[in-house]
Swiss-Prot record:
Assigned protein family: Belongs to the DNA glycosylase MPG family.
One record GO biological process: base-excision repair
Name of the protein in question: Putative 3-methyladenine DNA glycosylase
Organism: Staphylococcus haemolyticus (strain JCSC1435)
Species lineage: Bacteria, Bacillati, Bacillota, Bacilli, Bacillales
Keyword DNA damage: yes
PANTHER family linked: DNA-3-METHYLADENINE GLYCOSYLASE (PTHR10429:SF0)
EC number of the protein: 3.2.2.-
């Protein structure tokens, strides 16, 4: 997948339905991306690269598109795929996954089952047993990879405001969150809006 030559918002939409795979010593985990958020760097008041801020924790965000930027929030590991050329701190947060392979071990890792397994940015990374050390690695050159050939395509994509971003002016409500409409693994989805997962793909 091209992470560099198109707008980050387009990449965030294009990632919906892409298969994510993580392999540890014992297990292969996989699933389809159902929710993403775009973070637009220098001018995005909610982005870790806003204003060109550089600290050791955000070093990976300034690397070339296709780098994994992993950061911890409230003890949860959040995984972003960096976009754009080196030096431009933009990326896509992978917020939720519809699980495919390794579900029994995901239940063990999360001590949960059903939609709760992977319906949030810290939930799916724990389900997949992804370590913090993934930060800075290159997608598909490490244990975390994406498969754009064996993927799904959303029937409909919903654009909405990103989750948990108060007090950022215009950026609080910009529609930079992208979800597969009706997919029950999307975070914060109302039960009345949920469809059978299979009905949410073409």
């Amino acid at each position: 997948m091209d992470f560099v030559s198109r707008p980050t918002t387009e990449t965030a939409k294009a990632l919906l339905g892409v298969k994510v795979i993580y392999e540890d010593e014992f297990q292969t985990y996989s699933g389809y991306i159902v929710e993403t958020e775009a973070y637009l760097g220098f001018t995005d008041r909610a982005a870790h690269g806003f204003g060109g801020k550089q600290t050791p924790k955000v070093t990976s965000l300034y690397k070339r598109g296709g780098t994994i930027y992993g950061h911890v929030m409230h003890t949860h590991l959040l995984v972003n795929f960096v976009t754009q050329n080196e030096g431009v701190p933009e990326g896509v947060l992978i917020r939720a996954i519809e699980p495919l392979d390794g579900i029994e071990m995901m239940k063990h890792n999360r001590n949960k089952s059903g939609y709760e397994l992977t319906n949030g940015p810290g939930k799916w990374t724990k389900a997949f047993n992804i370590p913090r050390a993934i930060d800075g690695a290159t997608l598909n050159d490490c244990r975390l990879s994406i498969d754009t050939k064996h993927r799904k395509y959303p029937r409909d994509i919903v654009e909405s405001a990103r989750i948990g971003i108060p007090n950022k002016g215009d950026w609080t409500n910009k529609p930079l969150r992208y979800t597969v409409k009706g997919n029950p693994f999307v975070s914060h989805i109302r039960k009345s809006d949920c469809l059978n997962p299979d009905e949410t793909w073409k």
